[in-house]
């Protein structure tokens, strides 16, 4: 029985805790979401949980189900901010909350499903940025959504392409309010360091180390500008930097812009300039930006409908294996690329209207439009002009560098990351063809029998342009590709517009010679002066060992993607070709690793934000406790003095009443005593009168009898008159004495009472002075205590910030270490590939050079066969020496590369340490300044309080003096 009672006692608190569980308006507890929603697929993996595609079992409505593992009520409260924001928002361009469940320690948030997907995923799928009309529509819709959010006192704080979803109707939906803030007033400021680094505004970045400069809703305007750059260039500014290291770049550098501003409209550039204003005070609001010419003219969302249609189009993929056995083949022929490109803001129009051919130097694009019959016109251009146009507008890339796919709709930059750094396409990388320029000659593809062979001189001119200084830095990588556009003629036949070149024999040799001629001098010190033919051959078939490329084609695969979709009843077919290399896999791996770093940062931010929230709640509770304690002490002191005053007044009243009673009694007793004495005196007076009467009678009796009667009568009349006068006088004297005596006693009593009242008044005033002095001392003490508490709380906040910063620095160093290891491993792998490839290259070269040397001996032979054999042996020995020198050179090159890589890694580590030290120093400086400012503020507050104390004392003394005078006046009147 006893144990059961104890069990009940111990179970009671648990029951009470369950009853106290906080209830939320928009969250269903203990309801299994699987009873109402069916999971039909997985959409992705977010920073805090997985996202599934779900369908309502009753209505069939689709939703994106965000499932988050939630371990405590505190974590649940963090996620409730997003749920409350979504529930309170009802806007065309903001995702809607359909349901929210908390079941089995899992939070399930059902959000409106957007079939178009996220914009960043669309850009990766199409391998290009968006065109300007599409960016305009997205920008306008985002501004309208932001205007609504800001009017609802909500700061999104995480705007980016990944949080912009598209519907099939061509509308956007802002999503992911996980780090958003809901304020109580529009101009409320925040100091939380939260968001994704690349899109953070400078004032948000500064909150990492400076909490005294909070930000407001205009931080979203900066993120909007960065997002527009991301839409145009696939990646945000500074994307080549580590997520942890980009923060200092944002804080110190000038506002970013487009990599190639000339390729975009002036309105776009001006819009970005206004949105990316470093000063939040002058940064425009969403309502002001809606009046900007960049978005004010947008009245349709057709560009987004086209984008969604292309992204959701049926895709047919075909992989072509380009493997060729290098040992059995002739030197590879490099086909010049006919790939005029267009401005990124014009590319989508090309894909839909088919007015101009376009593409890039490394992607094969085929576009097919089935609408109205079209004819194919061929313009005749002199060969020299063709060569100049081609040499100006085409570039050749190397085999072994990573290629980034260019879709049939864009000449996009490389969105991948090589060696952890971006390789964006600059103006030198990809030339564009403006609409005003004449189009390149269009040639029908000849049959194999009539396929023309370009003269070697023509091909030399094709490949001499990349040797120019401004091209070498950007066009060292060459890639043979074919540009093809397919159009249907009126008869329904497919015409293929292409530009092909075939090389054979000496033409190929001449082409290779001119392509790699700039590298021929590298090995000139190996051959003997007497071996001129050997030097010539070495120059003709030199190998680009620096870049690890060869003159023969490597084994590669080409991925062809064909998309077919309808736009306003027009069927559009876009074919893109992309050469698959190992480097692309590395780029994808680097992209994945960077996403992982961002995810780690997001988790770290969330954890830090939660810790900071817990600390702020603790500090707030401390302040409230101190305030309550101060109020309690103040009220206790006031109550004490109020009680003392009441007791003093009560004692005074009782004393006065007692004195009055005593005085009344004494007055009554004295009056009674005097009256008794006066009665006795009166009796004595009467006795004296009687005695005098007797004396008169005796005197009359002594007289003769005949005189007695008249004399008696006369004497008695005189006696009666004298007695009456004496009696009246005696009584009057007695009365006067009584009155004087009583008045004297009353006056004495009044004086005693007034003196007592005066003493009590002095005591009361002294008590009031003591009370006010005590309260003033308590106020001053409270000021000091409050200052000390604020100071300690500030130190606690900065201690947590330092702890979080050190934790973040450890994460940065860990990521930097992994990054450096990845770079070293990639370099080792590449060098191993080059070492493995070099023997094969040398065998192929030796075989080809030997064949050519023997041919030259046959042509120029002037000696015997023995001499020719000796020359062949000598040539073989020279080849062996040359190959040995090449291997040695490669080894030295690899060692230099490794040293440079290790030096670069050390430099990265030192730079990171320097940045971290700067952050720590900045945080310490800011803490010192805040503490100093807090001390100055306290001193100023104390000074003002003391200045205000003097008039308060004077007012009190004046009031007490007035009361004292009033009491004295009343006493005088009394």
Swiss-Prot record:
Biological process (GO) annotations held by this record are: intracellular signal transduction; protein autophosphorylation; regulation of lymphocyte migration
- Gene3D superfamilies named among the record's database cross-references: Phosphorylase Kinase, domain 1, Transferase(Phosphotransferase) domain 1
Catalyzed reactions: L-seryl-[protein] + ATP = O-phospho-L-seryl-[protein] + ADP + H(+); L-threonyl-[protein] + ATP = O-phospho-L-threonyl-[protein] + ADP + H(+)
Q: Name any one GO molecular function.
A: protein homodimerization activity
Give start-end ranges for the coiled-coil region(s).
Answer: 605-729, 870-950
Q: Which UniProt keywords apply?
A: ATP-binding, Cell cycle, Cell membrane, Coiled coil, Kinase, Membrane, Nucleotide-binding, Phosphoprotein, Serine/threonine-protein kinase, Transferase
Ranges annotated as biased composition (Acidic residues): 320-332
As for membrane topology, the entry says: Peripheral membrane protein
Q: What class of enzyme is it?
A: transferase
- Report the EC code(s) recorded for this entry: 2.7.11.1
Region: Disordered; residue ranges are 320-479
Where's the Protein kinase domain?
A: 37-295
One GO CC annotation, please? plasma membrane
Please, which domain of life does this record's source organism belong to? Eukaryota
CDD domains given in the database record: STKc_STK10
SMART domains, A to Z: S_TKc (SM00220)
Q: Does the keyword Transit peptide apply?
A: no
Sites where the protein binds ATP: 43-51, 66
Quote the PTM field.
Autophosphorylates.
The function of this protein is: May act as a polo kinase kinase by mediating phosphorylation of plk1.
Per the similarity annotation, which family is this? Answer: Belongs to the protein kinase superfamily. STE Ser/Thr protein kinase family. STE20 subfamily.
**Could you describe the subunit structure of this protein?**
Homodimer.
Name of this chain's protein: Serine/threonine-protein kinase 10
Tell me what organism the protein belongs to. Danio rerio
């Amino acid at each position: 029985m006893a144990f059961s009672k104890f069990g009940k006692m111990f179970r009671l608190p648990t029951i009470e805790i369950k009853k106290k569980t906080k209830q939320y308006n928009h969250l269903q507890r203990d309801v299994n979401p699987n009873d109402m929603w069916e999971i039909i697929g997985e959409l992705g993996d977010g920073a805090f949980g997985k996202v599934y595609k779900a369908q309502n079992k009753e209505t069939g409505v689709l939703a994106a189900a965000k499932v988050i593992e939630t371990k405590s009520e505190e974590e649940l409260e963090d996620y409730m901010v997003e749920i409350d924001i979504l529930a309170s928002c009802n806007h065309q361009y903001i995702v809607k909350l359909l349901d929210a469940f908390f079941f089995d320690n899992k939070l399930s948030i059902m959000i409106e499903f957007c079939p178009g997907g996220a914009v960043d995923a669309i850009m990766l799928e199409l391998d290009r940025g968006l065109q300007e009309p599409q960016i305009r529509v997205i920008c306008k819709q985002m501004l309208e959504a932001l205007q609504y959010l800001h009017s609802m006192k909500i700061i999104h704080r995480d705007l980016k392409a990944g949080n912009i979803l598209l519907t099939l109707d061509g509308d956007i939906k802002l999503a992911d309010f996980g780090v958003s803030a809901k304020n109580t007033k529009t101009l409320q400021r925040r100091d939380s360091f939260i968001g994704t680094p690349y899109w953070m505004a400078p004032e948000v970045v500064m909150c990492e180390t400076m909490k005294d400069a909070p930000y407001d809703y205009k931080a979203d305007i900066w993120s909007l500008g960065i997002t527009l750059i991301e839409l145009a260039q696939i990646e945000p500014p500074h994307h080549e930097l580590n997520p942890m290291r980009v923060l200092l770049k944002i804080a110190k550098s000038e506002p970013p812009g487009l990599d190639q501003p000339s390729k975009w409209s002036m309105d776009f550039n001006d819009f970005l300039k206004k949105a990316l204003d470093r000063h939040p005070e002058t940064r425009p609001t969403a309502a002001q930006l809606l009046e900007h010419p960049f978005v004010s003219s947008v009245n349709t969302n057709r560009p987004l409908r086209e984008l969604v249609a292309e992204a959701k189009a049926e895709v047919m993929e075909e992989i072509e294996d380009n493997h060729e056995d290098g040992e059995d083949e002739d030197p590879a022929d490099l086909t010049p690329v006919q790939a005029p490109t267009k401005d990124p803001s014009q590319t989508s129009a090309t894909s839909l209207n088919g007015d101009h051919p376009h593409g890039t130097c490394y992607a094969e694009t085929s576009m097919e439009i089935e609408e109205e019959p079209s004819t194919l016109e061929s313009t005749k251009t002199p060969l020299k002009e063709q060569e100049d146009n081609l040499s100006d507008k085409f570039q050749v890339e190397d085999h072994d560098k990573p290629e980034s796919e260019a879709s049939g709709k864009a000449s996009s930059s490389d969105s991948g990351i090589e060696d952890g750094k971006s390789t964006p396409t600059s103006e030198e990388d990809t030339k564009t063809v403006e609409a005003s320029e004449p189009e390149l000659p269009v040639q029908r593809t000849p049959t194999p029998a009539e396929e023309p062979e370009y003269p070697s001189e023509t091909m030399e001119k094709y490949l001499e342009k990349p040797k120019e200084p401004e091209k070498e830095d950007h066009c060292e990588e060459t890639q043979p590709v074919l540009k093809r556009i397919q159009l249907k003629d009126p008869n329904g036949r497919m015409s293929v517009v292409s530009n092909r070149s075939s090389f054979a024999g000496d033409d190929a040799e001449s082409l290779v010679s001119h392509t790699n001629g700039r590298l021929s001098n590298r090995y000139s010190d190996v051959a003997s002066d007497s071996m001129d033919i050997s030097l010539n051959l070495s120059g003709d078939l030199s190998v680009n060992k620096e870049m690890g490329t060869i003159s023969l084609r490597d084994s590669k695969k080409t991925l062809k993607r064909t998309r077919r979709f309808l736009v306003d009843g027009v069927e559009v077919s876009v074919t893109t070709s992309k050469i698959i290399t190992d480097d692309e896999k590395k780029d994808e791996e680097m992209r994945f690793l960077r996403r992982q770093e961002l995810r780690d940062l997001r988790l770290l931010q969330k954890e830090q934000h939660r810790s900071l929230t817990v600390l702020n709640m603790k500090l707030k509770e401390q302040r409230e406790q101190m305030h309550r304690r101060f109020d309690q002490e103040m009220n206790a002191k006031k109550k004490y003095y109020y009680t003392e005053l009441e007791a003093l007044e009560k004692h005074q009243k009782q004393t006065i009443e007692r004195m009055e009673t005593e005085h009344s009694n004494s007055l009554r007793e004295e009056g009674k005593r005097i009256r008794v004495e006066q009665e006795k005196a009166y009796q004595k007076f009467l006795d004296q009168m009687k005695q005098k009467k007797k004396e008169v009678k005796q005197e009359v009796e002594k007289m003769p009898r005949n005189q007695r009667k008249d004399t008696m009568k006369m004497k008695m009349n005189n006696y009666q008159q004298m007695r009456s006068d004496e009696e009246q006088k005696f009584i009057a004297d007695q009365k006067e004495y009584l009155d004087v005596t009583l008045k004297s006693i009353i006056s004495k009593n009044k004086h005693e009472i007034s003196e007592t009242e005066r003493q009590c008044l002095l005591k009361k005033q002294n008590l009031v002075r003591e009370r006010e002095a005590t309260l003033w001392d308590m106020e001053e003490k409270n000021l000091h205590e409050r200052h000390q508490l604020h100071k300690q709380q500030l130190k606690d906040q900065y201690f947590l910030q330092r702890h979080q910063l050190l934790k973040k620095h450890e994460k940065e160093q860990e990521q930097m270490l992994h990054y450096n290891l990845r770079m070293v491993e990639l370099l080792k792998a590449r060098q191993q590939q080059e070492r493995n490839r070099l023997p094969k290259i040398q065998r192929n070269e030796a075989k080809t050079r030997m064949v050519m040397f023997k041919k030259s001996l046959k042509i120029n032979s002037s000696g015997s066969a023995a001499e020719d054999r000796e020359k062949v042996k000598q040539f073989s020995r020279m080849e062996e020496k040359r190959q040995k020198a090449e291997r040695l050179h490669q080894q030295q090159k690899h060692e230099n590369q490794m040293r440079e890589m290790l030096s670069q890694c050390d430099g990265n580590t030192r730079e990171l340490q320097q940045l971290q030290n700067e952050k720590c120093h900045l945080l310490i400086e800011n803490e010192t300044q805040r503490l100093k400012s807090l001390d100055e503020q306290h001193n100023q507050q104390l000074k003002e309080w003391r200045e205000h104390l003097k008039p308060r004392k004077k007012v009190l003394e004046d009031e007490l003096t007035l009361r004292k005078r009033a009491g004295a006046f009343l006493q005088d009147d009394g």
